[in-house]
Amino acid sequence: MRNYYIFSNGRIRRKENTIYIENEQGDRKAIPIEDVDTIHIFGEVDLNTKLLNFICQQGKTVHFYNYYGFYSGSLMPRERNVSGHIVVKQVEHFLDPERRFYLAYSFVEGAIFHMVRNLREYKNTDEFQEKIKKELSNAVETTKISELMGCEGRARDFYYEAFNTFLKSDFSMGKREKRPPRNPINALISFANSMIYTTVLNEIYHTQLNPTVSYLHEPSERRYSLSLDIAEIFKPLLADAIIFKLINNNMIKLDDFEEDVNYCYLNESGRKKFIREFDQKLSTTIKHRKLKRNVSYRTIIRIECYKLIKHFIGDEVYAPFKAWW
């Protein structure tokens, strides 16, 4: 099974066990449903309830993105891996300040580890590495989630500041701006983070975890905040590594972006370039030192979810994934 990304405007229809994607020019592409894992829709596409019911019955997920390429929402089938016991345990760990803090700190620890790991690949970043590691030391001394997030935020600011030492000059970082991103590197980071978020959400869906109960990010309405927690670990490892490759190997250029008044975003060409590398990265396998077999990066994210379940039920204390190679 694979992910499908729809960029063109048009319509999607179902006929028997096949999905047909038709663009505005009338060109059609047939996709057998058994070949689909997830559908990502970036274009303006017409759908009907017959198709949506079919997709849900087959246990497939659809993610929607707005005009600028940023995540809008998801069609998630009815959960098939429901466990009231796991949900209760998740909530217990949220309500207990000590247990919640442990998990929140773990996500920050995993994120900072991979930030420093990325910077080790580049010259003239030692000072930034030390500042980032200092924030992790500061985080150990905190007692509140808000203080912990402050340490993580400062560490990430130092991390982004370091980008200017090794990224090509066309992609000067400036400061991190999300809403909206105002330059190409900020637009690329925001798009990449959206893709990490939806990938993590997909993997959570295949487990018994409830994606709305989180520990570092405050649970709230209208978002799957556990996806944000787990994504912290993988944004530097996956998204940022791809960004560095695209920019420094001249695989993505300024004409892959559109700039509006106080706004910058990836155009279709730029999105396709990132997604091509992203899909390839998710499929790349490494020899897992504990499982003693090759697993893909996508599977590593799924394993992270299972590690949390083991932690909740008391089988094994959770430790964040840290790339060892």
From Swiss-Prot:
Domain of life assignment: Bacteria
Segment forming the signal sequence: none
Entry's Gene Ontology molecular function annotations: DNA binding; DNA endonuclease activity; metal ion binding
Cofactor: Mg(2+); Mn(2+)
Quaternary structure annotation from Swiss-Prot or TrEMBL: Homodimer, forms a heterotetramer with a Cas2 homodimer.
Matches recorded under NCBIfam families: cas1, cas1_HMARI
Function: CRISPR (clustered regularly interspaced short palindromic repeat), is an adaptive immune system that provides protection against mobile genetic elements (viruses, transposable elements and conjugative plasmids). CRISPR clusters contain spacers, sequences complementary to antecedent mobile elements, and target invading nucleic acids. CRISPR clusters are transcribed and processed into CRISPR RNA (crRNA). Acts as a dsDNA endonuclease. Involved in the integration of spacer DNA into the CRISPR cassette.
HAMAP family: Cas1
Family from the record: Belongs to the CRISPR-associated endonuclease Cas1 family.
Protein name (record): CRISPR-associated endonuclease Cas1 3
Gene behind the chain: cas1-3
